[in-house]
């Protein structure tokens, strides 16, 4: 039924044709069940395991690898001779990588689907209904409830469907609907129509929503929506419809994959076309098809070389290390890619209750009467320290601590707070914190009594459990609570009737009252000044109300409660306690004692975190279900708004936002920093508008209502104390529910991205080198310098270790003084592309050069000519060009070993280059990142392992090298450091952003100035090695003069 909240009880009952006392007939139930179905959220039809596995292979990079593996497998099948077994290694390793990748992907997908299933925990199992087949209430399965059913609910029940209240059977009905609306306190319900058809859920005071809990009272109602038509069902539909946004890094890698696939395709085709003339060479037995297949194999090797197979593993490792560091800071990351996304967060949309505030109501101000002279009076105003439920804090007057037992008015005020109260404090030993038992407002009063300690109770030596209610217990021993007059909407107060535990002539029964100031003070005829009772005058009343109004609308926007007593109440026998309409008569002729002002206080550390966000160019937006006045006041206290800042067009309620046209809504999201009284749909809409401005949005939430927006935003952040739905829909969970933890996580995310950039560039330059190597080999007609299994080893193992170690580079000191990076900023800029292309070309040329050196100039090598090397496929006994050359020499493992050793060594040098993007190695020596030094040593050890430990040389088709050959490897590899140092110098002095090329006027370029900051231990360590390497003769020059 649409807009049931706007209809009268009679209209709603008439719509369903039902009588409140008898309920639906079985025939009606059957028809309604057929029309509306079961009252449950349908199980999400998850993807099958096969569908999930297939989905993992939709990534372009993965498809290229899969194609390469399949082709390699087919080619290996037709391989002949000794190479048959080794030929299968390559496709097997590639498939192993892909399977591991798919397993991780499927596992993450399965986790994501749990979010929707977690909603089921809010579905009640049973419900109490009236139906015509029985005269009394009956318990049935909640899923069998239909629209039109008459339902009974009472304290402790979970609401089984969306219900329009028809009658309340207790004094009041309180409902905890925080999981749905985010309201921090339970809500009082009534049965009157709410005429506004556009009312938000918080304002539908005559409705109960499925999955919420009854905090107090008993009522009857008619079901108006079941299953997916309930408010919680709509959230489920929204979650199902919400597509998970890909993180900026995932998008970058997708783009990189596309570009790479195009480049690979072009190069593979080019290599194959270049060699068409060689298809009929004698080595292929004169068969054009065999020649075509041979060069197709080379093209496949090229594809393997071009794909950075180690990249996914290195990224995962770096992100995983980042998550461990974040977990130590109480940020538990559920989705690895979101670690990097945190680094470019530009907007944080934060919940108020529990995140920016403690979600622990505390009394921070109170007053009692000091003096009354005629129509004027003065007040004793006090402030209270401590902003949690811990009974630790002091009462201050004029910024000095006071002893509360010295003020009679405070003793009576504490007595009212302790007795007119059904809540308590409890120490949770597992968590090590004090928690509320009962209502937040009443717990704040319980905590106040503990801080006041009006009877000077000895508290030393008490355990934390005993300490929780020590002072309250002393007061409760003095008087016995006989009965309670529950809160009602008409009088806006509640009271307790108490009798002394030790009756005497002076001590009599009393009624203690607390409630909304305007309701209580209107019924006060007297005021308490010290221990005397003085008549209330209009002037005194005006003074009291002006202070209360100031507290309620000032910078704190306190929630005020007036406290009063009835010194001579009627006897219990004279009262009619069955009818709550009479309660207001018994709560008249009251004596005003004092007033307390409370709030859900901001966390102490939040203000500094908001300031840090502003420095880092991150906008903080508060989004709350609370009212606008309170929200703006908290914003001012924590620095989202300035103390006197005009909040027009910067703060909106959900209703005000809805009344704007779409373009005005979009404009509002661009400028606003506070949204109050919002519904779940508003949060999702705000995220959409922010995303339309290319903002990277982090959204916090803890309730079921937050789940769709958490899923839609780039970074969904759930509270550790939040619902399972919110946690499973999020990328990150805050173990301590603290806003400051988000800021720490953003800082960590920025550091991780900077390091990730370094190792991605390092790996890509390595792959460029491998591509250039194979392309040059094919273009020059040389024998294979590197084979696919060797390339896989380099990409996955020897390159992977230093790349992972680059993730340990220390973060920049000014990392939170820079604006968020643009998520569209390319991983590799034009200059960097040139730089790594240049390095890559050198790597490729050096690798091919090392193999050529062995053929042309090495001692113990065949010493063939360049022509013979580039036409080796024409080598046969009757060819005069190859007279005296053993054709088997072109299949020797030595040149391949030289090429692989140069590739590995040059990549280790390249890892040192990646220690800093633009800083020289002379100023930033390798031991700045000790993990990098360790990983380089480990990589080289693994390379020695495959060279010198049988049977690994056979698998990799290589052979051990002697000292002269290793010196040659070093000669060819070390120049890459000099080359990159030159490029860094250009970047530092001419291309660095914001760098002005101005000649310093004050500092002459003396020797000391030029050598300032150089690490001399590094220079002294490296110079002897370089001199020794280049002074040893290895016939290097012979290669060029042969």
UniProtKB/Swiss-Prot annotation:
UniProt membrane topology term: Multi-pass membrane protein
The protein's name in its UniProt record: Sarcoplasmic/endoplasmic reticulum calcium ATPase 2
Keyword terms: ATP-binding, Calcium, Calcium transport, Disulfide bond, Endoplasmic reticulum, Ion transport, Magnesium, Membrane, Metal-binding, Nitration, Nucleotide-binding, Phosphoprotein, Sarcoplasmic reticulum, Translocase, Transmembrane, Transmembrane helix, Transport
InterPro entries (alphabetical): ATPase_P-typ_cation-transptr_C, ATPase_P-typ_cation-transptr_N, ATPase_P-typ_cyto_dom_N, ATPase_P-typ_P_site, ATPase_P-typ_TM_dom_sf, ATPase_P-typ_transduc_dom_A_sf, HAD-like_sf, HAD_sf
Residues engaged in binding Ca(2+) 1: 304-305, 307, 309, 795, 799
Modified residues (3'-nitrotyrosine): 294-295
The EC number(s) this enzyme carries: 7.2.2.10
Family, as annotated: Belongs to the cation transport ATPase (P-type) (TC 3.A.3) family. Type IIA subfamily.
One matching Pfam family: E1-E2_ATPase
GO MF, one example: transmembrane transporter binding
Swiss-Prot/TrEMBL domain comment: Ca(2+) and ATP binding cause major rearrangements of the cytoplasmic and transmembrane domains. According to the E1-E2 model, Ca(2+) binding to the cytosolic domain of the pump in the high-affinity E1 conformation is followed by the ATP-dependent phosphorylation of the active site Asp, giving rise to E1P. A conformational change of the phosphoenzyme gives rise to the low-affinity E2P state that exposes the Ca(2+) ions to the lumenal side and promotes Ca(2+) release. Dephosphorylation of the active site Asp mediates the subsequent return to the E1 conformation.
Lineage, uppermost ranks: Eukaryota, Metazoa, Chordata, Craniata, Vertebrata
Transmembrane regions: 49-69, 90-110, 254-273, 296-313, 757-776, 787-807, 828-850, 897-916, 930-948, 964-984
Sequence ranges on the Lumenal membrane side: 70-89, 274-295, 777-786, 851-896, 949-963
Post-translational events: Nitrated under oxidative stress. Nitration on the two tyrosine residues inhibits catalytic activity.
Catalysis performed (reactions): Ca(2+)(in) + ATP + H2O = Ca(2+)(out) + ADP + phosphate + H(+)
Protein's job: This magnesium-dependent enzyme catalyzes the hydrolysis of ATP coupled with the translocation of calcium from the cytosol to the sarcoplasmic reticulum lumen. Involved in autophagy in response to starvation. Upon interaction with VMP1 and activation, controls ER-isolation membrane contacts for autophagosome formation. Also modulates ER contacts with lipid droplets, mitochondria and endosomes. In coordination with FLVCR2 mediates heme-stimulated switching from mitochondrial ATP synthesis to thermogenesis.
